[in-house]
Regions:
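Glycine/aspartate-rich loop-and-adjacent alpha/beta segment that forms the canonical ThDP
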Residues: 76-127
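Iron-sulfur cluster-binding cysteine motifs and their immediate structural context
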Residues: 103, 111-133, 140, 144-161
Length: 162
């Protein structure tokens, strides 16, 4: 579809969500990872270079969890009157075995505004009184909830294994 956009002189912004796996087929490596399905080293497709090779001038890579920068980039790119590509990069949270941060919600600081619930994180639920609870067994440690909370009701407490 990106090639057709370029060929037909369309406008618009395409987002490529690159977490170094093919999620729809069960966490398999894809052509940009540099590994075959058997885990053997192979040539890695350079996604930004591929986009540029078909004529896309505006190709931006951004960390998927850097919300402020991502929001800024999206606003800039959708305002352009030509095709642009935003590539969000972040490892698949289900395959990343590194130590994860542990977040807790301070119910006494929670203003019940719901901003932290906007991403739809399955680890976040509301208590009966409307305050937030974080299930640490489901939390992937991405920190989006802490970033979105303007009342410091969500806190990083330690790093631990998940």
């Amino acid at each position: 579809s990106l090639m057709n956009m370029m060929y037909n002189k369309a406008t618009g912004t395409v987002m490529i969500l690159d977490n170094s796996t093919t999620g729809m087929t069960g966490h398999q490596d894809h052509a940009a990872t540099g590994k075959t399905l058997l885990g053997e080293p192979t040539y890695a497709i350079d996604i930004p270079a591929l986009c540029r090779a078909i004529g896309v001038k505006n190709v931006v890579e951004v960390n998927a969890f850097d919300i402020e920068k991502l929001e800024k980039v999206v606003k800039e790119e959708v305002a352009k009157d030509e095709v642009s590509v935003i590539i969000t990069k972040s490892p698949c949270v289900l395959l990343d075995k590194s130590k994860k941060p542990v977040y807790i919600a301070h119910e006494d600081k929670c203003k019940k505004c719901g901003m932290c619930m906007k991403p739809g994180c399955p680890a976040m639920t509301r208590n009966v009184d409307g305050t937030i609870h974080i299930d640490d067994t489901m939390c992937t440690g991405c920190g989006l909830c802490e970033t979105l909370c303007k009342f410091e009701a969500i806190e990083l407490v330690e790093a631990g294994d998940r």
